[in-house]
C-alpha cells in the first residue's frame, strides 16, 4: 500500500494553515520534515493550506515565510518560488479538486449530503447516550435523484461525503507508531467538500501530497486518526499513498499541547526576545528525536544525524531552561564579529566606536540575550545601579581601602595586573576579599566577566570616579582592616 521513499527520491513537505504566527509545535514539525529531506539529499516542499479564508489573512502568510527563512528552513518548491507541481496554495487548486470530486461522484464513491448541523448534532447526541462512538449514520447515503432535486429546490446546499465501505479493516503502517488497524465500520462516511464548495482538510491534503509526489509525510500525532480516511481517498482515486510518520505531541509547561490558538510561544516571539535560530534548531531537533551527539550542531550535522527510527513516541515538554542552554551554546559558537552583528541593533550608540570587539570579547560568556549585553554596556560605559549584595560588599571595607585603591590605580596607569598587585600589598587583602569589593564598586554587581577585561572598557577616569563614590559610602562597624 504505502509507497516508501528511498534516499534517492525522498520528498517531504510542510503544509501549514496560515492562520496565525508559527508556534513551536509547527516549527518542530517543519524542522523534522526539512531535516529528513536535507539529510537524504531529497526535496522539500512548502504548501499553504489556506482554505479557512476567514482566519488566513495575507499578513500571516508573509510572516510564515519570513519566520521559516529566519529559522534556517529553505524549500525547493513553494508559493513564492513555484515548481513543477504548483500552485502551492490550496485556494488556487480548487479546479484540481473539482476533477477528483467528479470522479468520486461518478464512480459512486461520494454522494451529496443535505443534513444540517442541527441534524448531525442530534444524531451524535443519540449515539453518545447509547454509549456509541459518534459517526455519520448515512441518512443521505441512498437518496435518489428526485430526493436530491427536492432538497436543492428548497435551497439546501449539500456537502459531499466519501462513501466508506461497510465492512473490513484498514491497516495503516506508521514510521513512528508501527501498524495500526481501523475497522471501516467505525469510521463513518466523512465530508470531503463543505457546503460552500471549499475542500475539507482530509481531501485536499491527501490529494495534494499525491499530485506533488510527496512520499514522506511527517506531521503531529493529532493527525493519526486522519490517516485512514486519507488512505481511503487515495486508494479510491488510484493515487499513490505516502509513508506517514506522526510526531509525538509537544507539550507546554502546563502539560497541555502547544497551540497557536491558546497562547503558545511563537517562533516570532522568541526571535524578538533575541533567541538565535541555531539555538532553536538544536533544541527543537532534540524534542522527540535522539541524537548520539550531545553538543551543539550546525544545520548540516543536524540533518546528517536525523533518523526516523530515532523519533520517540513519548510526548516532549518544552523547557525554557533547556532552550537557554542551547542559546548559550549558539552564542559561544559565533565569532566576535557575528556576536556584534547580533547585538548591534540594540547596542548602537551604547558602546563607544572602536570598542565594539573588545566589549564583545569581554562580556560574551555572560550574555544569553541582547538585553544582557545592554546591561553590561551600561555597567561599562554608563551609570550602573548597585545591586544589594554589591552595596554590602562595598560597605564591608573601610574608606581607607578605597583611597588606597584610587591611588594605586593612578600609579599603575590603568594596568589591571599592576594595580591589583599593588593594592594587595598595600591593603593586605587577597582573593575574594580583594576582588569582590572592587567588582562591586566598578560594575555594581558581585559577579560577571573578568575584571581584567572590563577595566579597559570602563576606563581609568570612570573607574576612579566609581572608587571615589564607593569611598563615600559609610563602612560597616565590623571593618577593621584596609
Swiss-Prot record:
What is the free-text note on the cofactor?
A: Binds 1 zinc ion per subunit.
Where it sits in the cell: the answer is: Cytoplasm
The protein's name is Glutamate--tRNA ligase 2
> What are its E.C. numbers?
6.1.1.17
Q: Which domain of life is it from?
A: Bacteria
Write down any Gene Ontology CC term: cytosol
| Gene of this entry | gltX2
Q: From what organism does this protein derive?
A: Acidithiobacillus ferrooxidans (strain ATCC 53993 / BNL-5-31)
Database matches in HAMAP family: Glu_tRNA_synth_type1
**Which amino acids does the record list as binding ATP?**
260
Q: Where is this motif: 'KMSKS' region?
A: 257-261
Q: Which GO terms describe its biological process?
A: glutamyl-tRNA aminoacylation
CDD domains for the chain: GluRS_core
Provide the binding site for Zn(2+).
113, 115, 140, 142
Q: Where is this motif: 'HIGH' region?
A: 16-26
